[in-house]
């Protein structure tokens, strides 16, 4: 939408987030959520006309347990105002494909195995983030999200995902791929 030479952008966050809670009595549990955001914008083409563009963004957020709330439920760092303990990874199409290959039994682990690191690796000017998603024989999946700020220490969040939770995750990620391509 042109408005005096400026384009307007709209961002739609899906109302529902997929969440897994893995609290522990000793307070060392964790939780995860997957969020979808759809960014719609208009950009000028080489011919001078304005064209709509759409970007579907997926984020995996893992948060450590921070204790218990006043009502006795587990609390997690993502509910704190200045959360610095949660780890967030923006999932690209390749990342989604690797997780789906693991959930479908085609691979034991998402991303590369062996070498300097295993799993999915993202790096930018602020540091790096890794996601390890591995099938555990007869027990479900192990998840580890970690970030290392440039010049800082590694911060990690890890928990398990049951086979049932994995099936729901598979359906949601397949739906995300369809959303990306509008199929």
Language-model-derived ranges and their functions:
Residues 1-183:
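Positively charged, low-complexity terminal tracts
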């Amino acid at each position: 939408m042109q408005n005096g030479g400026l384009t307007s952008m709209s961002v739609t966050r899906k109302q529902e987030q997929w969440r897994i809670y893995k609290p522990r009595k000793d307070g060392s549990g964790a939780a995860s959520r997957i969020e979808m955001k759809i960014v719609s914008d208009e950009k000028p083409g080489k011919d001078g006309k304005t064209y709509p563009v759409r970007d579907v963004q997926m984020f995996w957020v893992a948060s450590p347990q921070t204790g218990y709330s006043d009502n006795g439920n587990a609390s997690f760092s993502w509910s704190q105002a200045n959360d610095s303990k949660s780890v967030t990874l923006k999932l690209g199409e390749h990342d989604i494909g690797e997780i789906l290959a693991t959930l479908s039994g085609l691979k034991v682990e998402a991303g590369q195995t062996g070498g300097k690191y295993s799993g999915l690796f993202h790096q930018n000017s602020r540091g790096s983030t890794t996601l390890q998603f591995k099938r555990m024989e007869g027990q479900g999946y192990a998840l580890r999200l970690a970030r290392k700020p440039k010049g800082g220490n590694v911060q990690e969040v890890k928990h398990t995902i049951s086979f049932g939770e994995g099936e729901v995750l598979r359906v949601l990620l397949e739906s995300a791929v369809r959303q990306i391509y509008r199929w």
